[in-house]
């Protein structure tokens, strides 16, 4: 682990039905329609990686990116990621069928395979980094809601900082991320379809998110990126970044000590 001072955003919930933040008409957010980033590089990662390598690439991008960057990616096999503060004992029962990985970010349990997974890196040199973590979280999800509203039904953001009063689906853990909407999560027809978690260091901020029910083949990824910035360009990842990712995958994310840290 780095010696840098690091914080991981983890929003816990209680039993209360959330109200909604209107993604199109919220008087408290006059800049809701203004793109978050002046410039944004996009990395459409077409390779299917192991869970450890996916986490490693995200961290390597945080360490090397010179500007705001969004990465969209696949999973080599069905996977389950859980937050930095999560307990391995809560997910161990899924080890036989899924590739388990502890994220560097906070949050709950997320099942991967049929989702559109993304990460956003914001270097400390970018003005957006100076905003609060929850403000960044909300603005990113507003952009996602805008992208979804162009091709899907009514999409809103959960306003309450507490989770919905609902009974978890049978067979799913109570700390399943998508069973517990929190403030600024993306909702469609009363159901959470997108959530995320963050890690902030002196180098920048990393947000890792999952959009359930949307495959990489859809045009949602491009619409999402364009809602975040009107000046997008494709990222060419350097061999140096890949080498750093391979090191992190082997020495950190792929190790038993990291997986069973708690």
Specify the residue positions occupied by each region the protein language model found.
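Intrinsic disorder/low-complexity segments
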Residues: 1-38, 154, 164-173, 230
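Active-site loop/lid in soluble adenylation, ligation, and acyl-transfer enzymes
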Residues: 33-95, 99-103, 109, 230-262
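Short, conserved charged micro-motifs
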Residues: 90-92, 127-131, 216-222
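Residues forming anionic-ligand binding surfaces in small-molecule and nucleic-acid pockets
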Residues: 108, 112-127, 207
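Compact, glycine/acidic-enriched structural inserts
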Residues: 128, 135, 151-153
């Amino acid at each position: 682990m780095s010696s840098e001072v690091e914080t991981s955003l983890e929003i816990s919930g209680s039993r209360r039905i959330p109200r909604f933040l209107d993604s199109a008409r919220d008087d408290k957010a006059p800049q809701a329609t203004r793109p978050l980033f002046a410039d944004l590089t996009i990395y459409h990662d077409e390779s299917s990686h192991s869970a450890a390598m996916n986490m490693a690439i995200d961290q390597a991008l945080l360490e090397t990116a010179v500007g705001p960057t969004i990465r969209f990616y696949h999973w080599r096999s069905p996977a389950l990621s859980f937050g930095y503060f999560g307990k391995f004992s809560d997910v161990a029962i899924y080890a036989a069928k899924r590739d388990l990985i502890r994220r560097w970010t906070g949050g709950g349990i997320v099942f991967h395979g049929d989702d559109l997974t993304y990460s956003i890196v914001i270097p400390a040199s970018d003005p957006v980094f100076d905003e609060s973590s929850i403000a960044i979280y909300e603005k990113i999800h507003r952009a996602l809601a805008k992208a979804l509203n162009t091709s899907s039904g009514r999409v809103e953001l959960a306003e309450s900082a507490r989770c919905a009063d609902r009974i978890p689906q049978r067979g799913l853990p109570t700390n399943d991320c998508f069973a517990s909407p929190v403030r600024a999560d993306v909702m469609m027809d009363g159901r959470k379809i997108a959530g995320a978690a963050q890690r902030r260091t002196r180098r920048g901020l990393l947000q890792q998110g999952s959009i359930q029910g949307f495959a990489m083949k859809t045009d949602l990824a491009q619409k999402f990126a364009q809602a975040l910035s009107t000046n997008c360009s494709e990222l060419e990842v350097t061999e140096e970044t890949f080498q750093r990712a391979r090191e992190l995958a082997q020495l950190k994310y792929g190790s038993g000590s990291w997986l069973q840290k708690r």
